[in-house]
Amino acid sequence: MELERIVSAALLAFVQTHLPEADLSGLDEVIFSYVLGVLEDLGPSGPSEENFDMEAFTEMMEAYVPGFAHIPRGTIGDMMQKLSGQLSDARNKENLQPQSSGVQGQVPISPEPLQRPEMLKEETRSSAAAAADTQDEATGAEEELLPGVDVLLEVFPTCSVEQAQWVLAKARGDLEEAVQMLVEGKEEGPAAWEGPNQDLPRRLRGPQKDELKSFILQKYMMVDSAEDQKIHRPMAPKEAPKKLIRYIDNQVVSTKGERFKDVRNPEAEEMKATYINLKPARKYRFH
């Protein structure tokens, strides 16, 4: 859940930075799980031209965030590289915490030998350098914070930086709406804000594995549950009307509704005598 919250906060901040007018309602747990899965497949090395399909990733993000394809490919690659580093650091912290707690629980059998002054100086220098790097990282993280996050942290001390960024990104930078969302989530009960895995309200927390599976099936699996209850009644074929026959002067005519008819004048016998029959006469042969 911690890794998914890091991905969601970074993705929302990235989209709001490069697409201020984009609709963030399409960013849900499904796309966050997809991005987290892509980063886990890439490993700690991060994206490269060999193991990362930029076109497929851009096409997938374009379906959820219209306009994502207009962001330069280099900017997207830098964001994925940076996010991969953040996830690797978070995994290292999670792995170090159980080990440190186990070491603290053990009772030392023999006293540690005294350290030399040279080793003490080297450790002091390394600790000072590590503290300087941590301070630089904190300064860079503060520079990347969305405007208004510090106000939310002052009003809600129990709210973390990732939660404040999440809510502010969902509210599209509107501070009043973000405060209202946090208040409505906090009214559900103080138990919703206790524990490391329950920092966000119920409606802002990501679902569990079973809930995510049922959510994906419900949203993308097309199953008509009422199909067995339907009765198929096909339309009866239209029968062609019977052809009507009309007669005019004892002659069969069409049914198009003719209004006029050729009227031939009777010919005289003298005129008929002038006609020539071009058809030759039949020859009758008797065998």
Curated annotation (Swiss-Prot):
Positions bearing Phosphoserine: 110
UniProt-annotated location(s): Cytoplasm; Nucleus
Entry's Gene Ontology cellular component terms: cytosol; nuclear membrane; nucleoplasm
Summary of the function given for this chain in its UniProt record: Down-regulates ESR1 protein levels through the ubiquitination-proteasome pathway, regardless of the presence of 17 beta-estradiol. Also involved in 17 beta-estradiol-induced ESR1 degradation. Controls PGR protein levels through a similar mechanism.
Ranges where the record places region Disordered: 92-141
Protein name from the UniProt record: CUE domain-containing protein 2
Gene Ontology biological process: negative regulation of cytokine production involved in inflammatory response; negative regulation of macrophage cytokine production
Tissue expression as described in the entry: Significantly up-regulated in breast tumor tissues compared with matched adjacent normal tissues (at protein level). Levels inversely correlate with ESR1 in breast cancers and are lower in low-grade tumors compared to high-grade tumors.
GO MF assignments: ubiquitin binding
Domain of life from the UniProt record: Eukaryota
InterPro entries: CUE (IPR003892), CUE_CUED2 (IPR039805)
Alphabetical UniProt keywords: Cytoplasm, Nucleus, Phosphoprotein, Ubl conjugation pathway
Domain CUE: 144-187
Domain topic, free-text comment: The CUE domain mediates interaction with PGR and ESR1.
PANTHER family found in the cross-reference section: CUE DOMAIN CONTAINING 2, CUE DOMAIN-CONTAINING PROTEIN 2
Similarity comment: Belongs to the CUEDC2 family.
Major location category of this protein: cytoplasm
Complex and partners: Interacts with PGR. Interacts with ESR1 in the presence or absence of 17 beta-estradiol.
UniProt feature, compositional bias: Polar residues: 92-104
Disease: May predict the clinical outcome of tamoxifen therapy of breast cancer patients. Patients with tumors that highly express CUEDC2 do not respond to tamoxifen treatment as effectively as those with tumors with low expression.
